């Protein structure tokens, strides 16, 4: 048996995408700054003109899952970080948006095999959002750490699975259309 655990130092450069909701940008820009600080301190060049991190701005948190899934389907990224802020108001809108964004981000990850990190603050007040985006702590940092760890872990798991299959020279019968190391259109469940 083996034990697998992601690390925060990469031997190979990572390729990441960050999807940011523009709505509540007072909060989301602070989350992004925390995310970039973490990446830089862990050896990832966060420069948007560099070759390691792509940034995609969308109107709000509700649009984040669709874009994250589209990026994940390209299989160009080791992980995708989703940043946004949904703040409760006087109507049930908060409940609908929060639930669908959460489901959508999880589905994007499950359907593609790419870690898609849930970095959407769901809070009752703007004060709570600001506290989580830099006044008390910056969760943008935490979301970047999650992405680094999951990208590392998935690389380890893919490598181990590929090595195991190459030793037996065949894929399990349960996955007749699958290929080693990448998801094919025939094996993808949508």
Swiss-Prot record:
Belongs to the DMRL synthase family. GO terms for biological process: riboflavin biosynthetic process. It comes from Nostoc sp. (strain PCC 7120 / SAG 25.82 / UTEX 2576). (2S)-2-hydroxy-3-oxobutyl phosphate binds at residues 90-91, 132. It comes from the Bacteria. Pathway: Cofactor biosynthesis; riboflavin biosynthesis; riboflavin from 2-hydroxy-3-oxobutyl phosphate and 5-amino-6-(D-ribitylamino)uracil: step 1/2. Its EC number is 2.5.1.78. One of its GO terms (molecular function) is 6,7-dimethyl-8-ribityllumazine synthase activity. This is 6,7-dimethyl-8-ribityllumazine synthase. It catalyses: (2S)-2-hydroxy-3-oxobutyl phosphate + 5-amino-6-(D-ribitylamino)uracil = 6,7-dimethyl-8-(1-D-ribityl)lumazine + phosphate + 2 H2O + H(+). The keyword Transferase applies. 5-amino-6-(D-ribitylamino)uracil binds at residues 23, 61-63, 85-87, 118. Keywords: Riboflavin biosynthesis, Transferase. GO terms for cellular component: cytosol; riboflavin synthase complex. The gene is ribH. The keyword Transferase applies. The active site is at residue 93. Catalyzes the formation of 6,7-dimethyl-8-ribityllumazine by condensation of 5-amino-6-(D-ribitylamino)uracil with 3,4-dihydroxy-2-butanone 4-phosphate. This is the penultimate step in the biosynthesis of riboflavin. InterPro entries: LS, LS/RS, LS/RS_sf.
